[in-house]
Amino acid sequence: MIDISEKIGTAVAMVSSYHNNKYGIMITASHNPHYYNGVKIIDSNGEMIPEIEEKTIEEFVNSKNSCVEDKNMSLPEIYIGYDTRESSPEICNLIIKGIKIYNKDSIIHNLKLVSTPELHFKLFNEDLIYIEYLKNLCEKINYPVVCDCANGVGGYILNKLNYNFLQTSNTNCINYESLNFKSGSDYVVTEREIPTYFNNNHNKLHASLDGDADRIVFYYKNNDSINLLNGDKISALIAYYISKKVENLENIAVIHTGYSNNSFVNFINKLGIKTICTATGVKNLHSEALNHDISIYFESNGHGTVLFNKSYENLKDLEQFFHPTIGDGIMDMFGILFILQETSITMYEWDNMYTDNPYHLLKMKVFDKSCFETTKNELRLTKPEDFQQYIDTVCDEKTRCFVRPSGTEDNIRIYVEGNDINAVNNIVMLMESWVSSNYIKETFTKNDKLFIVDDLKKEDYDYKLYPSYLDLLSQLTIINPKNINREDFNNFIDNLNQNHFIKVIKYKYTNQIVGSITVLKETKLIHDFGKVGHIEDVVVDKALRGYGLGKKLVDIAVKECQDCYKIILDCNDENVEFYKKCGFEWKGNQLALYKK
């Protein structure tokens, strides 16, 4: 992050100048551990920037180009804020430097320590003071709550309010390492664990913010565990309150993702409020929310808000409790407390509005997540078609399952839900088996021969037909297969890890290994603990040379080293041209000292 901070400043300044609009840069990594950091870019309306502007900024930051466009446009105006991470002030200074590289006269408002919603709020309405606005809301609340602030900026804000109904914990903003550590909304949702501070009072409602205070979840103690009131429960309570206040619910909607439990969806529909499912991600929820008079949307992690695109007389008190452009954990908390207070609903009654169906969510690694494409709302696969057909076969009217590609790595997420836990578990096993059989190992064809890509495994020692794996290595260098027994081989495999691994190519139906490549990743102190990839021991069975398997092995290794800032290999002179064709180039000289 440090390495690209200047360029981020320059890129946002360019966009601000080009559009003649103010922009915001929030330095935060939200719910992540203290050693991570990142930025969120905000437009002049306090909204998240559109995808096209996000792409423009990313392309400039990731390019080698350090030049900037014509400066004969408007003067950039940038608002900057950051949360409590140790690296934030340094990143802020570098971003300011980058802004001034574009134009030294740029207008820069450094707000320093703020929450993400606070910076959005500032851009939405410069005349309103966020803390004063929160104080006015507090005057309307007397419902007690204990709030875990994740040792983040939320504690810094709440401690300024000092109201009797509000008890705070985990407010240590000085010890950077405590940020989000065994506390905060993500910890509560993911681990279903009690935060480190937990007050033993069974009869009190508890809440947890995350590090930059843009999300909130609620819970109460139940023996040694907690009953979680997540984003769906938050949406349900708000929808219930609105349904009692408004006669015509036609233009009111609850926006959710496929991960919302069907019991929740059915509860909302019974209230007379429509539900709309979008793709995962707050940007997708927010985009749909703009289409209705009132839209309620919360992800299960507690990130969300209520958008009042049209004011309703009976809801004017409620409207002021929700952030107008983005999820705000503190305002959302106050809004929920206001509803509980107005309706006299207990936390137990809130929790029992509906009961979730049994469900299971799992993540599986696949060889190429780009093989998986979904409908717009992600509830069905459009590719691979046979996988969706299989899902339709194993699910009945009481069960559902959807699959979607996830994140930057080659993973897919599988969600299964049903009325019966045994049925859910059975479908989970079927999904795991299907994915393992079809998508974990890459399959490809060369010269009408079918191959798979795999990791070297202990059972590969058992292949006895010539050439075995050890015989294959003897085509590369000196090795005596007779001197390596099963125990030695197994110990070697046990010592392989994510930074030292061997990829092999096999015939699909015989499992004979016909190609192998070794990858090592070395973590450096330089380049912010950057990694260097080393490619070693590339070999293809001599009977299959000329099939393109060597190029395939190198491509596999390069893909595995995507998190490395450079990749190094050494080779014999006769192989130099081959590796040049694979994208490698001369870089210095490689010397070696072999022990006799």
Go through each PLM region and give its residues.
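Conserved active-site alpha-helix within GNAT-family acetyltransferase domains
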Residues: 551, 563-569, 573-595
